[in-house]
């Protein structure tokens, strides 16, 4: 029975990874990957992915559809909570002042957190609410592309 559950979870994780990658986000799977991207000048949107229902039903669709906008971050990246633990922990080092939360979004500018959309701002909200929150961050911190 455990084997079937593990196979099922592997499929769920793979689907979640593919969905966010297809939307244009680059997966960061190590602490070094995280530092290499987040220490760069400019803006990076970090999506902290997870297998929970609000990630699949709200956060990932919002992550994809929010990109249909004039102002965008220079880099789109994702870490996977519970899967790529080292990368997720390293990303959270940049989220100063925020508790660990997944799914979530963090906008990093010049290596520093600007603002974060936490799980409580995603769970129980609809996709358009989260898209609007993301695009408000883009308006505030990003340039037209």
Swiss-Prot record:
Signal peptide position in this chain? none
Q: Which InterPro entries match?
A: BrxB/BrxA (IPR009474)
What GO biological process terms are annotated to this protein in UniProt? cell redox homeostasis
Instruction: Tell me which family the UniProt entry assigns to this protein.
Output: Belongs to the bacilliredoxin family.
Please give the name of this protein.
Answer: Bacilliredoxin SERP1075
